[in-house]
């Protein structure tokens, strides 16, 4: 019974918050809200600068490699397990996967954002 009350309360609260977040921004839309703000001055240039998609892809690739390397951080604690062969196999497999992924990105020129 307590589980049902908790689930119903959470669902109701989430639905209420999503509804409020959906309808609230549409109440007061005027031109000053949609214009860029630079410390009270008129904008010197366009606030919508072009963004390099190649740089974005390099940044995402870096983030993925960084997260994969973070998987190696618990290895010193994992080395104290009784089954050392499994731990070493998984660690070497992860390092091999990182090396192959880096080689693939390098050969496909995915790490260069200048042309």
UniProtKB/Swiss-Prot annotation:
It catalyses: a ubiquinone + NADH + 5 H(+)(in) = a ubiquinol + NAD(+) + 4 H(+)(out). GO terms for biological process: mitochondrial electron transport, NADH to ubiquinone. The chain crosses the membrane at residues 3-23, 55-75, 84-104. Keywords: Electron transport, Membrane, Mitochondrion, Mitochondrion inner membrane, NAD, Respiratory chain, Translocase, Transmembrane, Transmembrane helix, Transport, Ubiquinone. It is found in: Mitochondrion inner membrane. GO terms for molecular function: NADH dehydrogenase (ubiquinone) activity. Pfam families: Oxidored_q4. This is NADH-ubiquinone oxidoreductase chain 3.
